[in-house]
């Protein structure tokens, strides 16, 4: 089937447009952001949050963010807990996966002093036990992109850096999310929704925008893939280079193309899956935010062991860097160089 990557309804998208064009919100924010969220438009309208600022698309040394950045504060006893939202594909879904300004998006969140990044993405399932409407917390990635996307801050002439990527996601972040596994529901069916998580759960990232052939889909299964999308690379790599704990929540919409005798998929089924996924994404995001606002988890305080790692990863000596290169580095790490 032709998987629809935007996991939220047009109505919610229009609602977001109103939020993101609200001239009454300040266009500057001088506080500290605790959590960055990258994903679909419906996540901007959570009951536990109140928008307090709407930053125009942020200009970074690596381009401009894919959308304005909405800053919201927690509605409750800890109103100092702030969340920054970026729509990965733009307000009107105008950026295809290959053209998303991934470096600008992640750099903006880093510049806002985010402590962690939570990402949402629609995926196709490569395994029979991961059903449409199920959610997955992957811990590994197979990169099948084509080298078209800018995937590093440290790959330009005059700057060399190598970061470890053996564990591309934050296991502590995933475990934190997994405590809410019983919160997602499937009210329209007797079939329950599941949140899948283990250390070998793997997401395949393909270039797109076309979807897999049947042969490719079967190959990805042989590789050990569990789900497939077009967004996790280079997002996860850039989060690592920014020393940010990062976890993607994958939302299954279909079985990709590997099933030889798949039943025809109807428009009603697709819309139902997308609607249910959007509802559960809101539920899960709300639970995570409410819990974090009550007590920020340790992995966010400590950076999950990533803090300071970039100092050891840059091979180029500062005295050999150009002024422009140093300015770019200081945008991400103002206290390192």
Curated annotation (Swiss-Prot):
E.C. no: 2.4.2.28
Keyword Glycosyltransferase: yes
Keywords for this protein: Cytoplasm, Glycosyltransferase, Nucleus, Purine salvage, Transferase
Pathway: Amino-acid biosynthesis; L-methionine biosynthesis via salvage pathway; S-methyl-5-thio-alpha-D-ribose 1-phosphate from S-methyl-5'-thioadenosine (phosphorylase route): step 1/1
InterPro entries: MTAP, Nucleoside_phosphorylase_d, Nucleoside_phosphorylase_sf, Purine_phosphorylase-2_CS
Top-level EC class: transferase
Binding residues for substrate: 230, 254-256
Reaction catalysis annotation: S-methyl-5'-thioadenosine + phosphate = 5-(methylsulfanyl)-alpha-D-ribose 1-phosphate + adenine
Note: Present with 4820 molecules/cell in log phase SD medium.
Name under which the protein is recorded: S-methyl-5'-thioadenosine phosphorylase
Organism of origin: Saccharomyces cerevisiae (strain ATCC 204508 / S288c) (Baker's yeast)
